[in-house]
């Protein structure tokens, strides 16, 4: 795996310089069992254990502060608890905002429209199950297919998981995408338009690695006629699009420990920037305990966050860049 090379110096340092906390042995073993963690060498396990202990301390202190009303969300030691923030983004982020970005904003707002206070497209059967991208930076592909899956459901009444692997393998150099090394949602939509379709997940399953393009038009599950980009940084436009059109692909800054260890509540990270690095899907919005939020579907499996979802702060100055690059496809 990509992180192993960078981990080698850390392994040597960990064995030579740092000692594990023996009082955490039971909980370490329990956590490994819970998430089926296995390590090839003792040095690797020691290094992972030390990262895990550091993350555990971070989680415990954060949750203590949460109990005192200092945070609007709490954290948990999920399956990513033995990784650093840099590793998580290196493996699972890899968003590639196209260079010389030329925004083609075609969205027309209806500012006089009364929008619902809350929306959740899961309740309308327009959102497929949470996926797990593994150690492949295909977040952009999962965000793109998630948005198109909803449009397919709205048009045909059928909810079908579409193939992220189709995008990883086929939406490549011409579109500026690099498969597991990153891509972008609008260029994925453009590929589907040019290709006259995308296969289903069932016919073209996810492999979490780059492969040869195997698109089969006979197994085409959906098409895309165009896509729409929203105005940069406008949370009002994003809210309107989510309410009226369906789930929207967005890009966010997900590089913080607080993000990948999020468990519940409304995520607000003061150090979050608008330098986006991860593609996700906004499937709704609402208010929880007086905090406005975006309901976001991630692609890090069910063990991430709240069953694979995170509520991110809304109306907080384009927090984490969530309204910087929104787009949605149409069939």
UniProtKB/Swiss-Prot annotation:
Coiled coil: none annotated. The active site is at residues 139, 278, 298. Keywords: Cytoplasmic vesicle, Disulfide bond, Glycoprotein, Hydrolase, Lysosome, Protease, Secreted, Signal, Thiol protease, Zymogen. Its EC number is 3.4.22.27. It is an enzyme of class 3 (hydrolase). GO terms for biological process: antigen processing and presentation of exogenous peptide antigen via MHC class II; proteolysis involved in protein catabolic process. GO terms for cellular component: extracellular space; lysosome; phagocytic vesicle. Its main location: other. CDD domains: Peptidase_C1A. Residues 17-114 form a propeptide. Glycans are attached at residue 104. The keyword Hydrolase applies. The keyword Transport does not apply. GO terms for molecular function: cysteine-type endopeptidase activity. It is found in: Lysosome; Secreted; Cytoplasmic vesicle, Phagosome. Residues 1-16 form the signal peptide. It catalyses: Similar to cathepsin L, but with much less activity on Z-Phe-Arg-|-NHMec, and more activity on the Z-Val-Val-Arg-|-Xaa compound. Disulfide bonds join 126-224, 136-180, 170-213, 272-320. Belongs to the peptidase C1 family. Thiol protease. Key protease responsible for the removal of the invariant chain from MHC class II molecules and MHC class II antigen presentation. The bond-specificity of this proteinase is in part similar to the specificities of cathepsin L. This is Cathepsin S. The gene is CTSS.
